[in-house]
Amino acid sequence: MRSISRTTFARAYLAITFFSVSAGIAAEPVALRVESFTVLPSTGPLAFVEVENRQPDPYRGMIALKPPEGWRIVPAEREVVLAEKETKRISFAIELGRNAALNSYAVEVTATAGDTKVVRQQNVACASAPYFKPTIDGNPDEWKDAIGVRFTEGGKRTELRTYWNRRSFSLLVAVEEDTLIGQRRSGAFDGVQLAISPADSRTATSPDKVADRYEFLLAWTGQGTAGKCFRLAAPETQLATTQNNRDLSSLQYDDATVAVTRTDGVTYYECSIPFKPMRDRIRPSEGREFFLSVLVHDPDGTGIRDWGKTAGLWPWQRNRLAWSKWPGAKWGKQPPYDNKLHWGLCASKY
């Protein structure tokens, strides 16, 4: 029996609701977001809060992070001083934390300046890849020891699981969808688009800049379990180039291994990408942090599912230049969110 089944999806859907509450966010003096943990809470990591000054004047306030019940975080609050439009990461140490089976942690962050208080509630996940080398054969049974990150869009569920070893980075994306459309010469088709970026990178806002990311597209060929990987961007790729619908055959990346299967209404995209071309910017080692985000393309169903939305990026962090265009994609009215979401490499989930 497959370890990531439709039943598992149903239980996760009932037990987890990712949410964010911050009324009138655009009018508030600061914006708040708790980042995903990059190692398991039980190991005592740091929790990071992003604070952005949204007003034209300097901001000085106190930031408090309320963890799940039974946890202990220090300090209780920290002062932040921000210049106009400045953003800072504020760290809190998790002295006592517990791992949740469904990898969902309810937190609340508060910014207080005088009589003005901003509150945001989120459910955050641990986004980290344990050390293991899976066989890329379309069978997800080997992925039970990976850390599952789950989200729901349009009533359909998606789960991400990752592994790493010294030679490769591996990814399993389980997509609940009504039908699977394989790659074809014309018309929209299903796929998974992922962006991997160094921890010191930033997405530019001008097309004359470079991509500064490694970006890939996974798709089913329409035959058996065969899948293809296309390399849409490398760090030196001009962003203007990424906004053209280039011929995918010229972008096929044969160094990656891909398998695609479908069982009980769930499509499984399984892929292994070599670290060698990325090693100069992302060195594979325990404790390494980098950026990873995923778009799921379901053109005849939910449309685009964006991990950045679930991870709590702010509405103004949508950026068309963060993702490459490609023939067969069906984009929504709004651009997708930025691709700079924290991810980590760890030894094990135990």
Predicted features and spans:
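Intrinsically disordered, low-complexity Pro/Gly/Ser/Thr-rich segments with frequent PxxP/GP/PP motifs
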Residues: 71-98
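N-terminal leader/targeting signatures
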Residues: 5, 14-15, 147, 165
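Short acidic, flexible loop segments centered on an aromatic residue
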Residues: 54-70
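Structural preference for beta-rich elements and adjacent junctions enriched in aromatics
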Residues: 34-38, 50-55, 92-350
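N-terminal secretory signal peptides that target proteins for export/translocation
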Residues: 1-9, 94
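Beta-sheet-dominated interaction scaffolds and their linkers
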Residues: 27-48, 79
